[in-house]
Regions:
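Phosphate/pyrophosphate-binding loop motifs in nucleotide- or prenyl diphosphate-using proteins
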Residues: 1-186
Length: 186
């Protein structure tokens, strides 16, 4: 009796398991490599998806230079998925004429750099400031997901560039909030 041929495996897992068809509980990590949908990298990508949704709503509520900055931020966030999936380096962070270090400096020293002391958002603040604050929290949550997704057992990160980029986007959100609070141009 002839031996039936085994169908070729279209999909594999990182540890070598093979599947002819993609199981519903799994998704693509990259190429034909599948992982469970609960995998930390997939959770990170879900965080990016949520962050994009928050950015879209925030940009829709904004106008002028603030809207332009938020749209540029959206493009940058979308590039983080590409960097993850294709294992490419993250592009240089640059917003409001500031590089990553400048963004950090302005957000850490707002009174010196922006003429506005630190503050806690309040219900009386303009709606766009509160939306920016919500956006900032979405960035922070995504940064935490990235830390989890890219942490190695020795405490280092496989993708420190992605984590740092998200940290600087959080700084950018603070700067935008500060500028709205002080009533100046973004």
């Amino acid at each position: 009796m002839p031996h039936a041929e085994t169908p070729p495996s279209a999909y594999r897992t990182p540890d070598g398991a093979a599947f002819a068809e993609k199981p519903e509980h799994m998704t693509h990590l990259r190429g034909n490599i599948l992982v469970p949908k609960t995998h930390p990298r997939i959770a990170f990508r879900g965080g990016i998806d949520t962050l994009e949704a928050e950015l879209l709503l925030c940009a829709q509520a904004a106008d002028g230079p603030l809207r332009q900055t938020l749209c540029a931020m959206l493009d940058f966030v979308r590039s983080l998925i590409r960097a993850d999936v294709l294992d490419e380096p993250v592009q240089t962070v640059r917003f409001l004429g500031l590089d990553g270090d400048g963004l950090r400096e302005h957000s850490h020293h707002p009174e010196r750099e922006e003429g506005q002391p630190h503050f806690l958002p309040a219900p009386e603040d303009p709606p766009i400031l509160l939306r920016l604050n919500r956006l900032r929290t979405a960035v922070r949550q995504t940064e935490l997901l990235a830390c989890h997704a890219f942490s190695r057992p020795d405490g280092t990160l496989a993708r420190p560039d992605i984590v740092k980029a998200l940290n600087r986007l959080s700084s950018l959100c603070w700067i935008l909030m500060i500028r709205v609070k002080r009533g100046g141009q973004v």
